[in-house]
Amino acid sequence: MRSVNGVKGVDAFLADLRFDLAHPPMTVHRLDRDTTGCLILARTREAQRTLAGYFQDRARFARGGSDPSNPTNAREEPESLGAVRRVYWALVSATSTLASRGTIDAPLVTTHAGVTLKPGAGAKPAATDYEVISRASPEISTAAGRVPALLALEPRTGRKHQLRVHCAGPLDAAIVGDYKYGYRDVSRTGGIADDWRRLLRDVDERTRRLEGRAGSSDSASEVRGPGVPLHLHARRVEFAHPSSGGRVRVVAPLPSHMSLACEALGLALDGDDGGA
């Protein structure tokens, strides 16, 4: 189910999660359409206010930008900003020279056409830490030197489509299945090497068979079109419990289309759940 309004939006399922409470749980934040993984829900109004406050604190901090009086051009984050942490996994088409880890610091502007990179007036600060979890064998690379890689992405800010734009732009590692920002200048089935595309389509069909949807035109297909699905997953979320203050850590298993794609591309998933 999706956390945006529209096709099978998460709001349509909240009533089923009410159980013995007087009202359904409430959403604290959102995920982009077709992004899978962890989503925080609150059982009480008080919990929702506290949890939402974590995100609002981070947003206020982001709006402040960097401090030019600081010689390192960095500011100390308020303690409350550590109350929530989100790590995403993304399957990308990377260059062979992509560094093992780093930080993308690139302001974003939202327009009627989408989100674009634009420093200066009107731009909002946006920063993302990334780390390469696994790279495919060089034998799978394309003639242009592109190679599949699995990244851990940790947004420092929460801008709309931030991870997708940062990957496609400054990182030059478009997320597989991102036809809005990754492959916007080609047809919806283009932008990926032919052998990758055939492999990922086979994976998508295998996923449908495993989920009993073979040959179906489900709502997810209607949203994403004829190409492969978006390979972006909210892998882990950590936050302070709104009542006890204890640390809560939740890890969401990869959806079938991502785990099967990683297996087919030879991307190792060993070790912990990744962190940027």
Predicted region positions:
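Surface-exposed loop and edge beta-strand positions of immunoglobulin-like domains
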Residues: H29, E154-R156, A240
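RNA pseudouridine synthases
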Residues: M1-G145, H231, G246-R247, V251-D272
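Pseudouridine synthases involved in rRNA/tRNA modification
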Residues: P138-G145, H166-A276
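Short beta-strand micro-motifs in enzyme catalytic cores
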Residues: Y88, V147-L151, R235
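Short beta-strand segments enriched for Tyr within beta-sheet-rich domains
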Residues: L51, R159-A168
